[in-house]
Amino acid sequence: MIAVNVAGLLHEAPGATRELRLRDHYASLGPDLELAGPMDGVLRLQRTNRGILTRGTVMAPLRRTCARCLDPYVEDVTVSIDEEFLPSLDPNSSQPLQVDQTDQTLRIDDHNEIDFAPLLHDELSLTEPMHPLCRPDCPGLCSVCGAPLADGVHRHEADELDPPLAPLARLLDRRND
C-alpha cells in the first residue's frame, strides 16, 4: 500500500501543490507484478477545484520471464502518471458526496488518503509485453530435448524423432518400400 494523506491539500486553494518522492520504495503490487528492487519516482499532487491532480513518473525494476527460454530477467520500466482523484467526502463539511456506483473515477477515501498502489499496478501492468524476451536474439529452447540453446553447442542424432510422429514415420517407410 502506498497511501498518502491529502487532507491538508484538500483544504488549500486550487493550484496548491505537494511533491511526493518515491525513493527506495518497496510495495506489493499484486501476484502478477513482482518488483526486483525499489521503485523510484516523483509525483506532483496539485489541488484542483474538483480534487487532486497527480502527475509524475515512476521507475520500477520488474521481474519477467522470457517467453523463449523461460529464464527470469529484470526490466527497468518507467511509467507516466496523470490522473485526478476526487474526494468521497466534502472537504468542508466531511459529509459523503453523492457518488455514482458506475463511475470509474479514482477516489480519495473517507480518511482523505490516496492509495497509489492500484494505479501503479495498472500502469505497470500495461508495460507487460505480449512476448517478453530476455534479449532480442534469445534462441529459446531445443524443440527435441527442451535444453536452453544459449548454453552452447547442442546436438542430437539425425534419426531422433518426436515420439508422437513415430507412427507417421513408420507409415512413410512402409509406403516407400
Could you describe each region identified by the protein language model?
Residues 1-177:
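Structured interface patches
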